[in-house]
Structure formats: C-alpha cells, structure tokens
Amino acid sequence: MDAAFLLDWLNLVLRWAHMIVGIAWVGASFYFIWLDNHLHAPLDPADAAKGIGGEVWAVHGGGFYTAKKFKLAPEKLPPDLHWFMWEAYTTLITGFLLLCLVYYHGAEVALIDPSVLALTQGQAIAIGLAFLVVGWLFYDWLCRSAFGNDDLVLGGLLFLYCAAAAWALCHIFSGRGADIHFGGMLGVIMALNVYFVIIPGQRELVKAKQEGRTPDPKFGLMEIGRAHV
C-alpha cells in the first residue's frame, strides 16, 4: 500500500468529517437562532415565577417537545449540562488538516500559480497561515475597540477588510488557493470566537451559579468586548 493511496483515503475521510461536523455546527447555530426568534411568554405562571423568560412548543418525529429559556439562570444547575462547542472545534480541526493535506502538502499544484506570483512552498504556506491568524486578530481587536460599539461601523469595517483580503489573496495564490484561504479565514474567526469569547462567557455563567453568585447578564448575552456573537 503506497503513500499516495493512503493520502487519497485521508483526503476522503477528512472531507466527509469536515462536511459532517460543519453541518452539525451550522445546524445547531441555526436551530438556536430559530429558537430565540420564536420564544413566547411561558404558558404556566409558575414557570415565569421561576425566571423562565420564554418557551417554544414543537412537534417533530412523532413526539412533542418544549424548550424553555431562563431570563438569566436557573436556581440550581442540573448534573448534566450540554455544551455546544465541539461542533465548532472539530470543524476547525478537520478543516485545517484538510487545508494542510490538499493545499500545503500539494502547494505546487493547488496553491501556487506562477502566473499570479512566483512563490516557494514555504513562502506560500507562511502567507496562508498569516492570513488565517491576522484575520482573527484583526476581528478580535476591532470588536473590543471603540468601533465595536456601533454595529453599522463595525460591519462596514469588516466588509472592507474582507474585500481587501479577497483582493490580496487573488493576487497571491491560485484561484482555488485564494478561495479556500478566504473561506478558511472566516471559519477561523468564527471558531476562535467560540473558543475565546462565547465559551469563556458561558463558563463564567456556570461558575457564578456554582459559587452562589448572581451571574453577570453580559455573559449570557455574549457581549464580551461588545459584538462577539
């Protein structure tokens, strides 16, 4: 069994894994957006007295479901609390491994186009990684700066940055290489936002309840540094 055969199988496995966990991540995100947009006042006054701010009733797959959202936090946390984070982490990990396998290992074929810019494999990889890292650092700084206090300004600056990044990538890499690094930059921003902003905020909510403190509402709204949502 030669190395090329194994690399083909690894490519296939990573592609399927990346697609599956990516669907799980996006699906979970869309579900909670839908859930938040369809919450209504609890039907049972006792639920409102317990701090429940809204609920949704649904029927699916032959069963009835109800989902309830607290205004801040319950009086007591359950022993089993599900965290929605590994969907994002595994999407980032599988995507990065796939990027390394297809575009960095095979840079001469998939990433470098001498008619666009003559690069060595090492130079191309370094530039590609820099775009992924700098994209996150710029986004994080922008959200934590004064610009993050105005959604319109923030959105406009991010749009301009993305346009500049797309232009630069198209003048550095092949068409495929530019496309995948632009998408990868956005994916890294989203996944690291989960890791560095959203999940730490949720951990603080849980920690406050475990220590008997009143949770800070800003963590529940995921507004650390303002627009990190």
Language model segments and positions:
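A short, hydrophobic C-terminal helix/tail in secreted or cell-surface proteins
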Residues: 228-229
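Polytopic transmembrane helical bundles with strong interfacial aromatic enrichment
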Residues: 1-225
